[in-house]
C-alpha cells in the first residue's frame, strides 16, 4: 500500500524515521499504484466513477447517512462512464524519449485514450490514461505523439 504525505513548513529536514524520495520517484510510485492526481487525472470535468477511487474510498453497504442517495446513484451509474482510468506500461528502445502527457492511445488506428501522467521506469515508462470503457483490458495499444513517434504499450486495470 502506498502511503505518502507532503511536508510543508520552514524546515528542510524531515522528522526522523520518515523515508524521503525525489519527486520523480514519488510520481513513478503514484502512477504505478494507479492513484489519480489533482491537475492531471482530476479536475472539474472528472466523473469520480471513472477514476477507480470509489472502490477504495466509498462504502455502498453502510447504513443511512447524509448523501446516501448521491452515492447510490454513483454506484448504479459507474459502468456508464464513457472512460476509465487505466495503468499503462511501455518499453523504450535506446535513447528514446518518454511520451509526453497528452499522447494518444490507439487500437487499430482508432484513438481510444490519452495519457494523463507519465514517468520513467525500468527501461521504459509507466503512465495513467483515460481510455474508452469499450476497450477490453488487458491489451496492447500504440502510444502516438506529435513528433511522429510511437511505442507499443500494455494497458491494464
Regions found by a protein language model. Give the residues of each.
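Acidic, low-complexity central loop/insert segments
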Residues: 1-37
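Proteins with a high burden of low-complexity, intrinsically disordered sequence enriched in S/T/G/P/A and R
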Residues: 1-4, 11, 41, 148-151, ...
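Conserved active-site beta-strand-loop modules that form the wall/rim of enzyme catalytic pockets
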Residues: 4-5, 28, 40, 61-63, ...
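A short secondary-structure junction signal
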Residues: 5, 14-19, 41-44, 76, ...
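Short, surface-exposed loop/turn motifs that are enriched in glycine and acidic residues
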Residues: 20-21, 57-61
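Short, conserved active-site entrance elements at the starts or edges of catalytic domains
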Residues: 29-53
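Glycine-rich, small/acidic residue-mixed loop/short-helix segments
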Residues: 46, 52-58, 66-68, 72-157
